[in-house]
Amino acid sequence: MYTAGEEEIEAIARVIRSGALFRYGENSECNRFEARYARHLGVEHFALAASGTYGLAAGLIGLGIGPGDEVLVPAHTYMATATAVLSVGAIPVIVDIDESLTIDPAALRDAIGPRTKAVIPVHMWGAACNMNAIMDIAKKRGLLVLEDVCQGIGGGYEGKKLGSIGHAGAYSFNYFKNMTSGEGGGIATSDPKVAERARCAIDPCHFYWQGRSDSIKPFAGIGARASELMGAMLNVQLDRLDGIIEAMRAEKKKVLAGTRHLGNLGLTPSPMNSPDDDCAAQVMYLLPSEQAAQTFSKTIPSVIAGKTGRHNFTQWDQVLMHEGAHHPALNPYTLPENKGLRLTYADDLGKGSLDILNRTVMIAMNPAHGDADIDDMIHNIDAAARVALENASLDDVEVRKAAPVDLQKFDSVN
């Protein structure tokens, strides 16, 4: 969470004082947010859910994904991207990333099989995927595209908001995201049928609220409704979002400019697919070796992408162990409909991805940073680069005081 204050407190207090915490009622905060956020994204429909994970699941349900289908997911994303696929009875197929830390379009194209139905491009750490290439491949091969925007809220790609480019987009409003209500999520689309199915997945009583005759064919959903408390806080957070993103973009621009000379040492900024539309939540650098990345991250507060726990496929126990459901009879890996799908994961899976991840370091931006904070960050990056890439001694460099890495946010592991 970057910013929250009296406005959020007052908005939540107003809902509590009203006694109307259920989202279906007059002057609904949730309805207001859904309409406002849909306009912000440039889509026709937005539906709130209890979490980003359920937003992903609702998006898959909305698109008609289920048993018998494969869904392509990147090797670097929070495990919920893959487990959401399992939750609808489909099988996740893991695809390599490129140096942007997003799904590699060439690897995506090569991974398409006869029963591949969809792809989930993940705008990881707020960095946009190469959506032009992905949408071109999807159109030619008949794939559905569900953007995972859980970490990319506020970002865009070539002038379009993330999540508005594919057939649907899933969002998270978890505490660690660019816009937050503590927990929460949602699904965006301009397809009314996808929106209706997603809303029915989120709320098993959705059919009743609008009248049975006006709804689609009913199916059993799971209650993942938002509350008015979520809607109230998000309406305030939405007012803050553009300012948060603008501040981080300005900071990142200064940091990249101030460290450009370090490319001569081997500290290379990670490539971006649409840098002007970047969320700018992180500055990412690619180093020449794992050892250099480790030395860099030990010198100043920073995170190695390959050490972010369940953001890497090697930590997805439910997937790798084929434990895809709470009951054996529902396990997608043993469903007869999934016979013939790619159910196993090779021992050498993702070697290229792991090499990139273990050589990429990330430094978090923060809209609260002032000029002095940014100057200190640039100074520290210079110092860490000298230690990691020129074998300078820690005694030979000055490391200025900096905030520690939020290990909980990054699920960081040693």
Predicted regions and their residues:
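N-terminal "arm"/small-domain region of PLP-dependent enzymes with the aminotransferase-like
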Residues: M1-F22, L143, M362-A364
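Generic structural signal for small/hydrophobic residues in well-ordered secondary structure
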Residues: I12, Y37, G55, V71, ...
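Phosphate-binding glycine-rich loop
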Residues: F22-E70, A84-L86, I94, K160
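PLP-dependent aminotransferase-like
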Residues: I61, I65-V149, G156, V413
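Active-site region of PLP-dependent enzymes
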Residues: G152-E158, I165-Q282
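Conserved PLP cofactor-binding pocket of PLP-dependent enzymes
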Residues: H206-R212, K254, G258, S297-V361, ...
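Conserved PLP-binding active-site segment of the aspartate aminotransferase-like
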Residues: P271-S274, D278-Q291, T308-A329, N358-A372
